[in-house]
C-alpha cells in the first residue's frame, strides 16, 4: 500500500510538471529548463522518502554514559557498521569478522540505532529492554538472550528471513509474534526462572504465535514459561519440542509426523494423543493430569517418562520411569 501511494504521488507530479512544461513552450528556454529541474528535484525527493533503510533499534536500562557492546556480522564485505549512540551523530566502525567482531561505544541517548544491513546480530547480556528490526532481509540469526526485553518489545517484523532466534531468559518478555517467520528453524525462548520473589520476573512468555502454514520450524525450546496454548498446525517439520513447566491444559501434536522428542512435563494436560507421531523416540510427560496413555503406534519410542498411569506397551521401549 505504501509503495502504491509513492507511485501515485510520482505520477501526479509527473503529469503536473509535464503540463506546465508544455504550457510554456512559447516562452524562453530558461524557464522551461527551470520547470524540468523542478520536476527532477521533486521526483528525487519522493524517491528518497520511499527508500527504507536497514536499521536495528535498541533501548536499554543502562544509565546514559554507560558502555554498550554488540556483535554484528554485516552484509557488506568491508565490514562497515554505522551507529547512532543516541545523539543523532552517526559513527562508522569496521568489523572484519575475524579479529574484530564487536562494536563498543557509549550510550548517550535513549535509543541506539544501527543502520547497516546484517547477516547476524548479537546483543545478548546487555541490559536491552527493546529490539526493533527494520528492513533486514539478510538477517538469519538474532541473539538477544539474557536481557530485560519487556512485554511485546521484541519486534522482528523486519527480519522475515530469520532462521534462528535465541531470546531466552528475558523475564519481562510476554509475547512473541512469529506468524510471518516461515523460514525460522530454531526458536529458543526458554525461561530459567530466578527467585520467585523477584518482582521483575513476570513468569515468562504467555503467548507464541507461529505461522499458520508453511513453517520450516524444527526445534522449539520454551520451557519454564506461562504458555497456556500453542498451535503447531502450520509447523509440520517440528522434530523437537520442549514445553516443560508451562500452563498447558492440552496439546495437539497429531500433525507433527516428524516429531522425535516431546517434553511436556509439569503442565496440566489430561489427554495426550500421539498415535500419529510414529517417529517419536523420546516422550516426557510426567507431572500432568494424564490417567491413560496409548503408545501402541509409537514403535520407535525408546525413552518414556511419565507419572503412574495405565499405558499400552510399545514394542521397542528401552526405559520407563
Model-derived segments and their meaning:
Residues 309-313, 317-321:
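Single conserved hydrophobic/aromatic residue that forms the stacking wall/gate
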Residues 36-38, 45-141, 155-160, 180-182, ...:
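N-terminal capping/linker segments that flank leucine-rich repeat
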Residues 121, 142-144, 163-165, 187-189, ...:
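Conserved hydrophobic beta-strand positions in leucine-rich repeat
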Residues 131, 152-154, 175-176, 208, ...:
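Canonical leucine-rich repeat
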Residues 118, 128, 139, 150-151, ...:
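Conserved hydrophobic position(s) of the canonical leucine-rich repeat
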Residues 19, 31-36:
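Positively charged n-region of N-terminal signal peptides that target proteins for export
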Residues 1-17:
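Hydrophobic alpha-helical signal peptides and transmembrane signal-/tail-anchor segments
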Amino acid at each position: 500500500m505504501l509503495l502504491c501511494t509513492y507511485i501515485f504521488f510520482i505520477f501526479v507530479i509527473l503529469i503536473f510538471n509535464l503540463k506546465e512544461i508544455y504550457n510554456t513552450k512559447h516562452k524562453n528556454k530558461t524557464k522551461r529548463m527551470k520547470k524540468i529541474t523542478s520536476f527532477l528535484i521533486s521526483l528525487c525527493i519522493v524517491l528518497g522518502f520511499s527508500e527504507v533503510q536497514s536499521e536495528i533499534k535498541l533501548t536499554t536500562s543502562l544509565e546514559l554514559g554507560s558502555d554498550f557492546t554488540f556483535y554484528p556480522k554485516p552484509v557488506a564485505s568491508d565490514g562497515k557498521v554505522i551507529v547512532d549512540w543516541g545523539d543523532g551523530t552517526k559513527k562508522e566502525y569496521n568489523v572484519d569478522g575475524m579479529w574484530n567482531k564487536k562494536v563498543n561505544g557509549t550510550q548517550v541517548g535513549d535509543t541506539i540505532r544501527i543502520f547497516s544491513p546484517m547477516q547476524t546480530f548479537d546483543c545478548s547480556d546487555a541490559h536491552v529492554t527493546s529490539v526493533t528490526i527494520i528492513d533486514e532481509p539478510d538477517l538469519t540469526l538474532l541473539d538477544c538472550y539474557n536481557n530485560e526485553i519487556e512485554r511485546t518489545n521484541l519486534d522482528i517484523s523486519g527480519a522475515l528471513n530469520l532462521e534462528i532466534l535465541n531470546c531466552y531468559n528475558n523475564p519481562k518478555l510476554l509475547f512473541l509474534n512469529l506468524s510471518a517467520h516461515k523460514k525460522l528453524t530454531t526458536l529458543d525462548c526458554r525461561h530459567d526462572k530466578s527467585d520467585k520473589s523477584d518482582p521483575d520476573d513476570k513468569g515468562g512468555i504467555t503467548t507464541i504465535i507461529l505461522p499458520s502454514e508453511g513453517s520450516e520450524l524444527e526445534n522449539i525450546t520454551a520451557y519454564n514459561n506461562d504458555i497456556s496454548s500453542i498451535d503447531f498446525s502450520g509447523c509440520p517439520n517440528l522434530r523437537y519440542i520442549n514445553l516443560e513447566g508451562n500452563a498447558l491444559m492440552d496439546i495437539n501434536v497429531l500433525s507433527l509426523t516428524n516429531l522425535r522428542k516431546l517434553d511436556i512435563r509439569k503442565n496440566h494436560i489430561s489427554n495426550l494423543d500421539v498415535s500419529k507421531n510414529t517417529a517419536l523416540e523420546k516422550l516426557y510427560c510426567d507431572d500432568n493430569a494424564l490417567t491413560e496413555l496409548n503408545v501402541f503406534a509409537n514403535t520407535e519410542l525408546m525413552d518414556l517418562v511419565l507419572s503412574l498411569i495405565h499405558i499400552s506397551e510399545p514394542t521397542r521401549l528401552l526405559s520407563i520411569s
